[in-house]
């Protein structure tokens, strides 16, 4: 076997390890976020259905589901890559991965692919369960798949950056509570930004999470707060920027190599 094939075999092995890591505790990593999304659906659809203005001829419950799917997808993609790195750093076994002949790019690809698998799988399960509650149309499946893949890749990359930066579990918790959660909840998951005052509509458009959710929702209803092409450009731009930062951090060994 050539050296190149051995390296890619190592990449696949690391990817498989990361997938099995979350799959072995699927009740926590898959079932739990699905249940949380359903609770949001039941509570918010009941409380806000008559108070939040959404798209014409789109019931609020149907409007809510794509947002919940994408929210869970993003959070779980981030959680998978970030938790893997911080646990390895705290436990001290990150050294066994760093000693392998994998390049920083292969290391990134393995962690990212596993994070995307978890995020996409959780989102798909929520979609299947949500069909029992409402008939959800699909207008542009291409946009749905595009933003699901890009969103999981972006948050998977973000998770790797956070995992590299954090030295302790409480730092990671702070990152999730003060960065990921506010960006998620202020991205239009539960409302259309057109229902907001003009100032907050402008503020929302500086949130990259808004473009991921709005583009994803456009695939279901053919309606959105902004053009899906604008959302695509913004999401790709943020993904490329974060990927560049992440690869620079991995290449330099920042907070990974003594």
Regions found by a protein language model. Give the residues of each.
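Hydrophobic transmembrane alpha-helices and immediately adjacent juxtamembrane helices
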Residues: 1-142, 146-258
């Amino acid at each position: 076997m050539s050296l190149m094939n051995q390296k890619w075999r190592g990449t696949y092995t690391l990817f498989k390890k990361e997938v099995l890591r979350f799959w072995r505790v699927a009740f926590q990593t898959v079932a739990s976020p699905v249940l949380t999304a359903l609770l949001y659906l039941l509570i918010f659809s009941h409380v806000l259905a008559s108070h939040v203005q959404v798209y014409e001829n789109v019931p609020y419950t149907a409007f809510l589901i794509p947002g919940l799917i994408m929210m869970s997808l993003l959070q779980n993609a981030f959680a998978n890559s970030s938790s893997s790195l911080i646990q390895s750093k705290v436990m001290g076994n990150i050294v066994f991965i760093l000693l392998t002949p994998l390049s920083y790019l292969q290391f990134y690809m393995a962690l990212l692919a596993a994070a995307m698998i978890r995020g996409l799988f959780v989102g798909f399960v929520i979609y299947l369960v949500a069909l029992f509650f409402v008939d959800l149309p699909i207008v542009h499946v291409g946009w749905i798949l595009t933003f699901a893949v890009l969103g999981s890749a972006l948050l998977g990359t973000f998770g790797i950056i956070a995992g590299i930066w954090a030295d302790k579990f409480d730092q990671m918790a702070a990152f999730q509570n003060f960065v990921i959660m506010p960006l998620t909840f202020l991205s239009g998951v539960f409302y259309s930004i057109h229902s907001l005052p003009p100032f907050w509509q402008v503020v929302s458009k500086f949130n990259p999470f808004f473009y991921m959710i709005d583009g994803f929702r456009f695939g279901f209803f053919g309606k959105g707060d902004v053009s899906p092409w604008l959302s695509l450009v913004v999401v790709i731009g943020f993904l490329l920027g974060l990927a560049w930062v992440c690869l620079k951090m991995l290449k330099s060994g920042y907070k990974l190599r003594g």
